[in-house]
Curated annotation (Swiss-Prot):
EC nos: 2.7.7.23, 2.3.1.157
Residue ranges that the Swiss-Prot or TrEMBL entry lists as coiled coil: none
Listed GO biological process terms: cell morphogenesis; cell wall organization; lipid A biosynthetic process; peptidoglycan biosynthetic process; regulation of cell shape; UDP-N-acetylglucosamine biosynthetic process
Top EC class, one word: transferase
Name this polypeptide is given: Bifunctional protein GlmU
UniProt keywords, alphabetically: Acyltransferase, Cell shape, Cell wall biogenesis/degradation, Cytoplasm, Magnesium, Metal-binding, Multifunctional enzyme, Nucleotidyltransferase, Peptidoglycan synthesis, Repeat, Transferase
Entry GO CC: cytoplasm; membrane
Residues that, per the record, bind acetyl-CoA: 380, 386-387, 405, 423, 440
Length: 466
C-alpha cells in the first residue's frame, strides 16, 4: 500500500493562551503531534508531511526528530490551503493520502487502517472518517440525502438549525486518492463566513464531477477528541493516562491507586512491580521486575534494575542497579550510576556520581562528582566539597573504605581502598589505602563552665532591673 499522510498542525491554538504551538503541548509525556505521527505510521504511511504555521521552527525540531517532514503554511487560509502546501513534497506520490489533525492524540493507527481499506474497497476519490456524537457542537455535520448517500459537510458556523441538529459529524480525518487531489483543492472557493478554503469543500468538487465520496464510521468517538484549550488538554491527559495504567495492570504491574498514579506512554515496567500512590514515572523510564515504587516517588528517564525500592524520592536521568533501596526523601540528580545492593537513605542527595555495589549512604549526606567503590560506608552528615567557585572537582572513595559521620571531603581528594576517615574530619589530602585519616582540632574542656554561665546570667538580670 502506497500511503502518505498530511498532518495539519498550523494553528496557533489561541484558546490555549500559550506561546507554545498547540501541537507541541504534551500528553502523557509526549507532544500531541507525536501520537498522531505514530498513528499514521502504524496505518502504513511511509511518508509524513506536517503542515506547520505558528512556531514552525519549534514544530520542525520535534517533527524531524520523529522522522517527518515540515512545510509551512503562511498565511493560514484554511484546511484546504494547508493541504496544498504539501503538493511539492507529494508531487510524485501515486497512492493514497491520509489527512489528519495534529491535535487528536487519541487517534489510533488501527482506525486509520480501516479508513484506508474502506477507501480502496469503495474505489473512492475521497473517504471521510465520521463519528456519532451526543453533543456535536463545534464539528462539521455530515449531511446525507434521503437514500443515505453523502451530500456535503456543513461547518458549525454555516449550518441551518436543521443541519446543526444532525449528530453525525466529520472528524476532520480524510483519505484521498493522490491523483487529482491538488487540482481539486485549487478549485475550491472561500464562500463561507470565515473566508477560508475548507478541505470538506473538496468533496463537493468530487461529487460534481461524478466521483465517489464514501464514509467510514469510527468505533470509539473518543479517538477524535480534539484539543483546543487547557480543559480539553486535561481531559485527554486523563483518558490517555487511564489507558496507559490499564495496559500495565494487564501486563502484571500492580497500581495501588490509579487515580493518583501518572505513567508516561514511553515508560516500560517489569512484572510484579508495585506502584504505590502519588507516584510519577516520566519519559522513557525503564523499571525492572518486582520493584517497589512510591509512595510519593518521581522517576524521570530513570533506569531501574529488578527489586529496586524507591520511596518518597526523586530519581532523574540516572541508572540504579538491582536490589538497591532509595529513600525516603532522597534526591538522585542526573548522571548517576548506582550499583546493585546499594542503600541510599533519608535526606541523601547524589549528583553526577558513581556508587559501587553494596555501598551504603544511609542518611544526611551530599555526594557530588564522586566515584565511590564497592562496599563503602558513608557516615551521616558526609559532604563532598566538589566546587571551588570556578570548577567542579572529583572525590574518589575506593572499595571498602569507611567514612565517619560529619566528614567533609574537599575535592580533589582520594580515600584509598580499605581506608578509614575519623568522624568530624575535614579531609583535604589523600588518605592512603588502609590508613586512618583524621583532621580535626583537639578537644578542649573548660572546667566549671556551667557555674560561670549561671553567674553571668544572674548578673545580667540584676543589671536589667536597675
Amino acid at each position: 500500500m502506497d500511503l502518505a499522510a498530511v498532518v495539519l498542525a498550523a494553528g496557533r491554538g489561541t484558546r490555549m493562551k500559550s506561546r507554545r504551538p498547540k501541537v507541541l503541548h504534551r500528553v502523557a509525556g509526549r507532544p500531541m503531534v507525536g501520537y498522531v505521527m505514530e498513528a499514521v505510521r502504524e496505518a502504513g504511511a511511509n511518508r509524513i508531511i506536517v503542515v506547520a504555521g505558528y512556531g514552525h521552527e519549534e514544530v520542525a525540531a520535534v517533527v524531524n526528530e520523529l522522522g517527518g517532514e515540515v512545510v509551512v503554511q503562511e498565511p493560514q487560509l484554511g484546511t484546504a490551503h494547508a493541504v496544498l502546501q504539501a503538493e511539492e513534497k507529494l508531487a510524485d506520490h501515486r497512492g493514497q493520502v491520509l489527512v489528519v489533525c495534529g491535535d487528536t492524540p487519541l487517534l489510533r493507527g488501527e482506525t486509520l487502517s480501516k479508513l484506508a481499506v474502506r477507501h480502496r474497497e469503495a474505489d473512492a476519490a475521497a473517504t471521510v472518517l465520521t463519528a456519532f456524537l451526543d453533543d456535536p457542537t463545534g464539528y462539521g455535520r455530515v449531511i446525507r440525502d434521503a437514500a443515505g448517500r453523502f451530500v456535503r459537510i456543513v461547518e458549525q458556523s454555516d449550518g441551518t438549525p436543521e443541519e446543526l441538529a444532525v449528530r453525525e459529524v466529520s472528524t476532520g480525518v480524510f483519505c484521498f486518492a493522490a491523483g487529482g487531489l491538488f487540482e481539486c483543492l485549487r478549485r475550491i472557493s472561500p464562500d463561507n463566513q470565515q473566508g477560508e478554503y475548507y478541505l470538506p469543500d473538496a468533496l463537493i468538487v468530487y461529487l460534481k464531477n461524478g466521483l465517489t465520496v464514501s464514509t467510514c464510521p469510527v468505533e470509539d468517538p473518543a479517538e477524535i477528541y480534539g484539543i483546543n484549550d487547557r480543559r480539553q488538554l486535561a481531559e485527554v491527559e486523563r483518558l490517555m493516562r487511564s489507558a496507559v495504567l490499564d495496559y500495565w495492570m494487564g501486563e502484571g504491574v500492580t497500581v495501588v491507586d490509579p487515580a493518583s498514579t501518572y505513567i508516561d506512554r514511553a515508560a516500560r515496567i517489569g512484572r510484579d512491580t508495585v506502584i504505590h500512590p502519588s507516584s510519577f514515572i516520566e519519559g522513557d523510564s525503564v523499571i525492572g521486575e518486582e520493584c517497589e515504587i512510591g509512595p510519593n516517588a518521581r522517576l524521570v528517564r530513570a533506569r531501574l534494575g529488578d527489586r529496586v525500592s524507591v520511596q518518597y524520592a526523586v530519581v532523574l536521568d540516572s541508572t540504579i542497579g538491582e536490589r538497591t533501596t532509595v529513600g525516603p526523601f532522597a534526591y538522585i540528580r542526573p548522571g548517576c550510576e548506582i550499583g546493585a545492593g546499594v542503600k541510599i537513605g533519608d535526606f541523601v542527595e547524589i549528583k553526577k556520581s558513581v556508587v559501587g555495589n553494596e555501598s551504603k549512604i544511609p542518611h544526611l549526606s551530599y555526594v557530588g562528582d564522586a566515584v565511590i567503590g564497592e562496599k563503602v560506608n558513608v557516615g551521616a552528615g558526609t559532604i563532598t566539597c566538589n566546587y571551588d567557585g570556578k570548577k567542579k572537582w572529583t572525590t574518589v572513595i575506593e572499595d571498602g573504605a569507611f567514612i565517619g559521620s560529619n566528614t567533609n571531603l574537599v575535592a580533589p581528594v582520594t580515600v584509598g581502598r580499605g581506608a578509614y576517615v575519623g568522624a568530624g574530619s575535614t579531609i583535604r589530602r589523600d588518605v592512603p589505602p588502609g590508613a586512618l585519616g583524621v583532621a580535626r582540632s583537639d578537644q578542649k574542656n573548660i572546667p566549671n563552665w556551667e557555674t560561670r554561665i549561671r553567674h553571668e546570667k544572674k548578673d545580667n538580670r540584676q543589671n536589667n532591673d536597675k
